[in-house]
Amino acid sequence: LVGSCMRSGSLSLEPYLEVIDNWAIEYTRDESGKVSFFDLSHFDTLPSGRAYRGNTLASPMMLWEGLTQLIGEESLERLIEAHTRWLEERLRSSEYIGYIGVDLFLYREKGQLCLHPCVEINLRTTMGVLAHFAYEQYVPEGKTGIFRLERGRGSATGERVIPLLLTGEDSRFTAFVELDK
């Protein structure tokens, strides 16, 4: 720990939080600098919480209903407005055009469910955006599934598992869509 601090020149301490659920709000930023809501993303991490495991594939309405059941529709709408204003202001002098993902999570503190409204901000096409397009492309209406990545060439099997591209000998990851029954 000391060696790592010496190399980086800094130390960051954060409280341990009992994370219950991971979400992201996806936005787009256009040429004029306007930031607009794109979609919600519900994702899972490895038990350590440090690595991505996969995204829920569901309609935008199902994702909206899932998160509003936990935090309320008014809270979600206010959060989207706050993110939008903050992102437009902070990116005013930026030339960035594209997707913006704001990760958030629900955690339990003293028995109460709480929302961390901004864990990190990603200025790129996020896994949530890819999951959105995978849902549109591969999931039949009314169905749900999981979008996931696996290290290595992968071995998609079964009629409910769809590899998203052919993998070559040098592939390091494989993307899959797995449909729920």
For each feature predicted by the language model, list its residue ranges.
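Short beta-strand element of the conserved SAM-dependent methyltransferase core
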Residues: 104, 121, 176-180
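Peripheral (often C-terminal) accessory segments that flank ATP-dependent C-N-forming ligase machineries
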Residues: 140-181
